[in-house]
UniProtKB/Swiss-Prot annotation:
A GO CC annotation given for this chain: voltage-gated potassium channel complex
Gene: LRRC55
Positions of LRR repeats: 66-87, 90-111, 114-135, 138-160, 163-186
GO molecular function terms attached to this record: potassium channel activator activity; transmembrane transporter binding; voltage-gated potassium channel activity
Record comment regarding domains: The transmembrane domain is necessary for interaction with KCNMA1.
Membrane topology designation: Single-pass membrane protein
Tissues expressing the protein: Mainly expressed in brain.
Extent of the signal sequence: 1-34
Name of the protein: Leucine-rich repeat-containing protein 55
Origin species: Homo sapiens
Lineage: Eukaryota, Metazoa, Chordata, Craniata, Vertebrata
């Protein structure tokens, strides 16, 4: 028996082709275990998931866990469920443009620490709340352009986005933008605000002054930003306004003005006293005349 085992040939080293196939199968199994099944109607390749232009009414479930670039553009998506991005911590690019979104759930980006590019253009957002980008500290680019119903941006909407470089708010319905919304963005390089119905009243002056100091490196579409009101500046380029344009917002009174106001107040007071005095005399005379008439009748 021992001689028989001694005479059996030992297998040689594995063939390179077989080794390669084994490695590929193992990698495939690992890839499958990581959750890389591609959703229906989507294409998945090199950590890019493309579900664009598929007439989707809702976001696809169960994306590959290692997704870095997700495109859901050109669909009919009306909502993103809370926690949708919880498992996709490698996500860097999220494209949701040209859908029917009106809002995003609170805390959507809580686990998307690597998210850098977010496209929300061509949707139906009416406002940007304070917690819309909560915990999305890695954002570099935000596109909110072409949201025609966008009327309000909360002063703290972009709070904590220290890495933000590009912000597009063009072609919306903004008439006013708080300076506070932009002051906390030290890295901002490109700001697009053209195509909005800006009301260039006194409340616009702080923002305009801030933008004018940064216009060379911050505002990309300064020629497209125009005033829709008040009537005296309607149609004027926003950045053509000067300090003289807001002169009425800073009226200062001279000593002569104060003296004139005091004089007018004094005259009004005297006139009021005199009027009350005359009314009192008239009432007293009427009372006496009425009493005298009653005595004559008796």
């Amino acid at each position: 028996m021992g001689d028989t085992w001694a005479q059996l040939p030992w297998p040689g080293p594995p063939h390179p082709a077989m080794l390669l196939i084994s490695l590929l199968l193992a990698a495939g199994l690992m890839h499958s275990d990581a959750g890389t099944s591609c959703p229906v109607l989507c294409t998945c390749r090199n950590q890019v998931v493309d579900c664009s232009s598929q007439r989707l009414f809702s976001v696809p479930p169960d994306l590959p866990m290692d997704t870095r670039n997700l495109s859901l553009a050109h669909n009919r998506i009306t909502a993103v469920p809370p926690g949708y991005l919880t498992c996709y911590m490698e996500l860097q690019v999220l494209d949701l443009h040209n859908n029917s979104l009106m809002e995003l759930p609170r805390g959507l980006f809580l686990h998307a620490k690597r998210l850098a590019h977010l496209d929300l253009s061509y949707n139906n957002f009416s406002h940007v709340p304070a917690d819309m980008f909560q915990e999305a500290h890695g954002l570099v680019h935000i596109d909110l352009s072409h949201n025609p119903w966008l009327r309000r941006v909360h002063p703290q909407a972009f709070q904590g986005l220290m890495q933000l470089r590009d912000l597009d708010l063009s072609y919306g319905g903004l008439a006013f933008l708080s300076l506070e919304a932009l002051e906390g963005l030290p890295g901002l390089v490109t700001l697009q605000i053209g195509g909005n119905p800006w009301v260039c009243g006194c409340t616009m002056e702080p923002l305009l002054k801030w933008l004018r100091n940064r216009i060379q490196r911050c505002t990309a579409d300064s020629q497209l930003a125009e005033c829709r009101g008040p009537p005296e500046v309607e149609g004027a380029p926003l950045f053509s306004l000067t300090e003289e344009s807001f002169k009425a917002c800073h009226l200062t009174l001279t000593l002569d003005d104060y003296l004139f106001i005091a004089f007018v107040g004094f005259v009004v007071s005297i006139a009021s006293v005199a009027t009350n005095f005359l009314l009192g005399i008239t009432a007293n005379c009427c009372h006496r005349w009425s009493k005298a008439s009653e005595e004559e009748e008796i």
